[in-house]
Amino acid sequence: MKKNKNNNQKAKIFIDKNSSLISFNKRILERLDKSDFPIFEKLRFCSIIDNNINELASIRLKEDKNLIKSLVSLKNEVDNKFLMYLFNIMKSNNLKLSKTFDKNELKELKSIFENKIKPNFQTIDNTKGINLRAISSGDTFFVARLENKEYIKNVSLEGYDLEDLYFMMENNEDIKPKKSVPEFILNFSRIDNIPRFYTLTTGKIVTLEMIINVLNNHIYKDNKFIDGGICRVIRYDNIEELQLDPELSTKKNLKKVHKRNNRSYPSLIEIDTDIDDKTIKLLAKSFNVKTNVINRFKLVGCSTAFNIDFNNIVNIEDKYFDNQKPFNNYDKDKLLETIKNQDVLLSHPYESYDTVIDFLKEGVNNPNVKSIYQTIYRVSSIDSEIIKLLCEGAKNGKDVNVLVEIKARGNEGMNLHIIDKLTESGVNIIKTYKNIKVHSKALVLKEIKENKINYYTHLGTGNYNEKTSKIYVDYSYFTYNKKLGEEVIQMFNTLDNKKDSKVSKGELFNYSVGSVREIICKELDKLDKALEENKACKCTIKVNGINDFDIVNRIYESARKGVVFDIVVRGECIICPIDNIKIKSIVGRYLEHSRIYRFEIEGEYDKLYLSTADLMTRNLSRRIESIIEIQDKKIKDEIINDLASYNYDNRNGFYQMKPGKWKYIDSVYPIDVQKYMYCKNNNKDTH
């Protein structure tokens, strides 16, 4: 916990950022223990935490060396949970993990290796030593310590004359080779895309590492196998060194990405518990790190271990979350007509993301739609429906303009390739700023009909990603509002012309760097002023994370004056529950991702905003985010009702009772907000 003294004001209390993130992941683990999620989904959640640990290790360890103990402890908890769930699956299906095999089973193991493992068993060429540049952060390998066949003790006499040899023999001195040859070498084989568990016809379960160890003589024919196991390397993410330049070619930017991914030093190396100390020392020497960077775990790469070949023996159907039903008040071929008559709000994943695809598809096929504008941050793949439709639109002769953010962490390489694909199809690529990320999510169809210009606009709180839309809770807002459409188009024009992003604002749509912070502070100023007239004031916030000290100080200031804050935050949270501040975290089956801000003055004022920005410094100070006031009464009421429903959840919720201390909310009469939202959006009875 940190205190920040500011003149005569009371000391401001903040939760440590890293402790907050560790706490969030522990909330997920606690929620899994109390949940009725299908067991395979519990495995998926464990893999999500594993990825979160990787991110912490790559980003935060450099500034906080003491964090390693907490990460290792959390990683061990996750491994234990994952293995417990995995063994429960095996037990319920009469399967057993085995280390002994008869002759027929050994033949089957060899067949599994040849057909399922070997095709993707990519061995790094280390004839001249380990090629560290070929090992990217997060890659999972089977590392084998092999006896070097070139090492022949006391035989390599090159460099000695006969007189020297005679003298050394007379004095019983060891004759060592003049040319240094290592006794052992390390062999790395990438296994990221290979299942970690397999089912034999006899019902036995065998691990990938067990197969390799049993068949080591068959696999490593040139050098004798001594020791081996699973290994994963997490490197420091030197994000400040990754200066991608939109003006450079894709090839040159990709070189920068690969350099960042492959040349930074390891912050954490995970290895199997069975790997011996000699192999650890050789790993440390090879990677030029201390042995304390290398840690043993029961399950290395939990997120990659989720790739399981169980021959579809497990039924993971669930009655509450079956096939999603799309918004059904329109003909999908006449979606634009529906939006022309009324604003539309979709709540994902409870309502299908296909509607967003259909919206773009109709724009591509509608002859009256002359131009398409879209932002791209994280899509599902280079071959996603979104990318295909944008290419199709350009090939059909439409004016397609796409802003692809090449600095999206982890997606830099794919986004650079997407730019090439779109460019080849004739899409106009709007280049982003070198030092500012564009995180806004917008899609506009410009229609020219009967000599009139119309705009159909989609704004979302989440990415244009068909895969994550199935598990992320987000809003899609569609409108025919001409003024709003013009202001969103202005954002694209401003970015395309590289005008000053700090002065780009509209009446309905704001997108400049710092605009979200400015709007929040102005709204809080109004609430503070209303308090002076003894009017009840309330601010409701729903975000993914809160870590900006200035905005937290501003919230503390209003809370001490009497503004009531109702905050729902999923992950990182440095704010404390002082008087007038209630903080709740929702950890459900779906990942809460929407950002909502509401400001109320009792009886006379009620402003509601949707945004792409969390209360994180990166969102508030270093990104172009979008924020829009919802004015349509029907949609506004729907979002307000959704916000209120989070207060009643006693199934997924944790309250922060004291600074950094969270308590799970339980009840004999469980209310699950996500099940309620699913039923509400699909016209199902909640009982």
Positions of predicted regions on the chain:
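The conserved SAM/SAH-binding core of class I Rossmann-like methyltransferase domains
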Residues: 568
